[in-house]
């Protein structure tokens, strides 16, 4: 594996959009066939969690863009993310001809997870851990598909923000990082794409409330990753497979987040 590993974070409503998911994995298959570059997918699945909790008659709230996760809800959330979402991603990979292995953040000690904030409940802070298992899986030609469920050192299941999880995994692997979501990148106050975003501008936009909630979490994770990895991190959309192939080949798509 001479080529730099690429970590792609998949988010937003992608998992509930079968047509978009099919197109995305078709693009990833083309990329893998042409580039022969090690690839790791990291996913959340907030929409599945919302649907499940609603069906169970349970409420769900967010604080500063992070889902508040009462400990009594974590079995359901883990089931939705590490179970349903992960296996749906794997199924799509397999149907596209990509051999895949489903993982969570705890497998092989990939990430070290601790409780982030008692006010958020079973929400984890994620730090890079041991990449050996994932490196071995990549060396065997498999695509690791990693859910954002972690486990603390004392055995507590934790819900981790998928942007933060992808950042920690990229750090552990020394990989490049691309974050894909519903939107085309980071948008300014007028809804226009910001092609390049540095730390000073990002902090200014967050202070003004232009970047807030989930997008603020994403930008903070991207800034942290850019700082730790010492390279730009791309925030873009999964909606346009042709643009995605250009992006994966090194083209300018979405927002490049730098220091």
From Swiss-Prot:
Q: Which InterPro entries does its entry note?
A: AceGlu_kinase-like_sf, AcgluKinase_fam, ArgB, Asp/Glu/Uridylate_kinase
Question: This protein's superkingdom?
Answer: Bacteria
Instruction: List the keywords (alphabetical).
Output: Amino-acid biosynthesis, Arginine biosynthesis, ATP-binding, Cytoplasm, Kinase, Nucleotide-binding, Transferase
The compartments listed are: Cytoplasm
The pathway entry for this protein reads as:
Amino-acid biosynthesis; L-arginine biosynthesis; N(2)-acetyl-L-ornithine from L-glutamate: step 2/4
Positions of the site: Transition state stabilizer? Answer: 9, 218
Q: Where does substrate bind?
A: 45-46, 67, 159
**Reactions listed under catalytic activity:** N-acetyl-L-glutamate + ATP = N-acetyl-L-glutamyl 5-phosphate + ADP
Q: Which GO terms of type biological process are on file?
A: arginine biosynthetic process via ornithine; L-arginine biosynthetic process
Enzyme Commission numbers on file: 2.7.2.8
Q: Name one GO molecular function term.
A: ATP binding
Look up the record and report any one GO term of the cellular component aspect.
cytoplasm
Give, as one word, the top-level EC class. Answer: transferase
Q: What does this protein do?
A: Catalyzes the ATP-dependent phosphorylation of N-acetyl-L-glutamate.
Q: Family, per the entry?
A: Belongs to the acetylglutamate kinase family. ArgB subfamily.
What name appears for this protein in its UniProt entry?
A: Acetylglutamate kinase
């Amino acid at each position: 594996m001479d080529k730099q590993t690429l970590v792609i974070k998949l988010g937003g409503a992608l998992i509930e959009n079968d047509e978009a998911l099919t197109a995305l994995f078709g693009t990833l298959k083309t990329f893998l066939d042409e580039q022969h570059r090690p690839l790791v997918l990291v996913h959340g699945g907030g929409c599945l969690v919302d649907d499940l909790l609603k069906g169970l008659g349970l409420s769900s709230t967010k604080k500063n863009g992070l889902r508040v996760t009462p400990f009594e809800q974590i079995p359901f959330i883990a089931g939705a993310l590490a179970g349903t979402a992960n296996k749906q991603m794997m199924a799509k990979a397999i149907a596209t001809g990509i051999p895949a292995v489903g993982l969570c953040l705890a497998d092989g000690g990939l990430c070290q997870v601790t409780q982030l904030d008692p006010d958020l409940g079973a929400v984890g802070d994620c730090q890079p851990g041991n990449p050996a298992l994932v490196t071995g899986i990549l060396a065997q030609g498999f695509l690791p598909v990693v859910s954002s469920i972690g486990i603390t050192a004392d055995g507590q299941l934790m819900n981790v923000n998928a942007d933060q999880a992808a950042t920690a995994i990229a750090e552990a692997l020394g990989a490049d990082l691309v974050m894909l979501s519903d939107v085309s990148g980071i948008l300014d106050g007028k809804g226009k794409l910001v092609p390049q975003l540095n730390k000073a501008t990002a902090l200014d936009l967050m202070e003004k409330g232009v970047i807030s909630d989930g997008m603020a979490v994403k930008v903070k994770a991207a800034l942290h990753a850019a700082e730790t990895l010492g390279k730009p991190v791309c925030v873009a959309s999964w909606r346009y497979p042709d643009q995605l192939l250009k992006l994966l080949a090194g083209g300018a798509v979405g927002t490049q987040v730098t220091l």
